[in-house]
Amino acid sequence: YGDIEPFGQKLIKTPNLNRLADDGIKLTQHYAGSTVCGPSRASLLTGFHSGHGSVRGNPKWTNSGNPVDLSTNDTTLAHILKNNGYNTAIIGKWGMAEQVPTNINAMPNAQGFDYFFGYKTHVAAHHYYWPTLFENNNEYKLKDNDYLKNQGKYTHDLFTEKALNYIVKQGETTQANEAGKQPFFLYLAY
C-alpha cells in the first residue's frame, strides 16, 4: 500500500490523494486477507478474517462440492455504504460468483452494489482478453476477444473507461441533485 505519497512514497507527488487521505481515513492494517485473490477480496469487502468468511479458497469447487461464492448472509462494505445513502459500484474483478449457471445472489448487485461491470469469476480474470464480462447481471459480449491469442479489447482499458464514465456520471448526478450531494463508492479492482 506504500505506492502513493500519503503512505510514504516520496518519488511521485500526489497532492489530491494527500488531501483525500488527510481529510478521510487511511486504512493501514489491511494489506491482504489471504494469499490468494478470492478470500482476500471477500475479507476486504466483509471485514471477516478469511478463516471466518464464506470464501476460503480459490478453487472453483471446494471439497464439499460447493462453489466458492460470497454468502448471501454476509454483509459487505457496499451494503453498509448503500444503507447510508451512497451509490455503490464495482468495476473489474469480482471473483466470488463461481456457480454455473450464475447464482444471482452471489453477484455484486445482490451484495450491495448498484452497478457492476467486470469478471464474475476469478478464472476469467486471469485472461485480459476474455470474451464475456458482466454488466450488472447481464452478459457483456466482446465478440472480437480471443484470450488464447491476446487479441481484441484489453479488458483493463475497458474497466478504466467504465470507471471514468461512472465518476463523471456521479458528478453530474450530484450537481443535478438539489437536495444535496450523494456520496458514491467505486471499488475498482484490476
Role assignments for model-derived ranges:
Residues Y1-Y190:
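Formylglycine-dependent sulfatase
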